[in-house]
From Swiss-Prot:
GO terms for molecular function: RNA binding. Pfam families: NusB. SUPFAM superfamilies: NusB-like. This is Transcription antitermination protein NusB. It comes from Burkholderia cenocepacia (strain HI2424).
Amino acid sequence: MKKSARRQSRELATQGLYQWLLSNAPSGEIDAQLRGALGYDKADKELLEAILHGVIREHATLVEALAPSLDRPIDQLSPVERAVLLIATFELTHHVETPYRVIINEAVELAKTFGGSDGYKYVNGVLDKLAAKLRPAETQARRNG
């Protein structure tokens, strides 16, 4: 199945954030490397930039929003799970036009693609809790049918 431009952007953002989390390289350096990555030409570049730079810029705020939904300190998570959760937290708070279920589903798929064998289950559980806090009206409406 062909990946959407938005999915491709999220995959590249995950790779870029993984690199940033491990190396703390400047975002411009990460940008340059991503431009040479497979699939860059098919990505929604505006979304990729918004996510990558937004997560790096607002890292501390996103971690603060995410922390109450975690069962352990964020630095004990794998870098892949951290990157995926930070992307989803950024999208939940900044891309309110995107339904929360879409954001969670995309995050689960990223965790399946890049993470450990059961990491996607953890990501799903954390984001369900987080979405209920960040988007209570939307999540309640979905639960009420």
